[in-house]
């Protein structure tokens, strides 16, 4: 078959905060950078990040520094973060937010003109920089404009299907132009995978429609290693009603500004679960507390709890929480006068492509940045660390990808692999009968929410793993579409996305089944305590034939050598 080949030095897959920052950095290093995204450019999930960006600037609390940021991140991550990556994050986050200001981002200020910082969950000091409650939107708009200023070529509405690997090194990616249905090959000397998360594998989620786990699946099939995939964050506060809004994010900034959680009995229940941090305990702790209140009959009739800011000054709410004010006004709730109803919602993948400090994976020439990578956040991500992650490791990935591109020749494309992938992609269109993907997608979301959610058990995880493996091996090859059109065929793209969702969900379920303890966001009702003797480890996933191989690896530590260490006992060198 014939196909179009597009050449670049550095190819970035994904156009969110991490991907665009990587492309900007590569272009600044004078290489030809290109971006491929399945959405319209500028419409990435990053714009939905509302609360803020963590950086130890000490503008509000003068005692803050990178060491406290490091400590809070590792404690918040249930001690299994890759500490080499955490050190990079906390030391470079301040410089990267200054980059954003230079690009044009407008951040809230203190009365003396410095970047303002607010409290966020499980943090010792106020270090979350913000732009009202629209921080991600502000940052993304700035990054998009900088990308355009540098004249970086962007291929939007192009769906990446498989990474191309030649003799152990990256060679590019195969893709479909959604607008035309044409099969394309993007060849590159280096590739940055920045394709975002997989929240859409869950029935209730904050995530955009595009967050279907494409990057996790592509990485696995290419032979890359993934880490911490059992660690899925459920944000404590998503909207409960109306049904069309269920799961939409209610930013942690609401609690950071003083919002209070209470149950149907008007009890401030976080006193029972986290008496010191209360509403600003870790997201894993608050999500489990809310879920337990509902399960034990102390929730609202709609299945949530109340989040109240009506005790705060109306002017403060209008200034610092304008998006939340508008979001709830649309459903008839004035948060200045009455409480919101909230419940947990699928939010963030802590696990993903295993990278080192240079953002390199185990595949030569494949770099990673943003939510598709793992190791930085460990067992639970702190609110505000995600945006910092996108900028710190987006820059590192773009910079190191450019350095590689400057010293290697253009790779060879395996024509047999490309033609085989084209047959797989178009095969679904050519099939005359089989299984419709949309019913399987509904079943997948319900399965993951019910059996691989906030509370997990061995029996349910085994059932989920078995079902997902069966779907992957027996159902995927039988997908049948009603529409045979190649141009803007949403059913076709959803079928291809569903393949990625199923393999990603299977990885999550199998890693969760293997980890026989509770740690961070991973809670096993049959193993409700942490087990540092046996499970102070990371779980690494790699494809083995038609199966998924899992193994334990020691946690990479630098300053904090064992769980439970106090800040004062850490030897900061």
Language-model regions, residue ranges each:
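Glycine- and aromatic-enriched mobile tails/lids
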Residues: 1, 6-8, 17, 22-25, ...
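Short beta-strand "acidic-cap" motif of Rossmann-like dinucleotide-binding folds
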Residues: 31-37, 228
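Glycine-rich active-site loop/strand segments that organize a redox cofactor
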Residues: 55-89
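Short beta-strand to alpha-helix junction loop
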Residues: 81-94, 127-145, 155, 205-213, ...
